[in-house]
Amino acid sequence: MSVTSITSTSAPRRIGAWVLQGIVATAFFAAGAAKLAGAAYMVQLFEQIGLGQWFRYVTGVIEVVGALALIAPGLVWFGGLWLGGTMFFAVLTHVFVLHTSPVPAIVLGLLNALIVYLRRDELAATIRTTTKIL
């Protein structure tokens, strides 16, 4: 299985993909760390959501794990899907629970979709390998 999915593309595209992954990973790591550290804004936000502070911790772990996956060769596609799914639920939460703008979550979700697209060969190789094992 190949750990670099865009090796057949140009160097600028590969570099751009890594830069994008780094930026998105940094954003999610910072957000997850703020949740885990109990930043006042995050505590208040999760009180408004109404599921309790345990959900803040779970969300923080999800974001940190996703951020780490975005910079781990071979797991980038997983991180993109993981965090893209997280942003889908964040959009729903912003619209239906918090009644606030979902735009930041939409943008982050689209950036994760772009990362998955750029790493689609890696994802396909993983699927092929998995189906051969099964």
PLM features: residue spans?
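Short juxtamembrane and helix-loop transition motifs at transmembrane-helix boundaries
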Residues: 21, 36-47, 62-73
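Core segments of alpha-helical transmembrane spans in multipass integral membrane proteins
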Residues: 30, 51-71, 85
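Alpha-helix C-capping/helix-to-loop hinge sites
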Residues: 49, 68, 91-95
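Solvent-exposed, flexible loop/coil residues
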Residues: 40, 55, 59, 127, ...
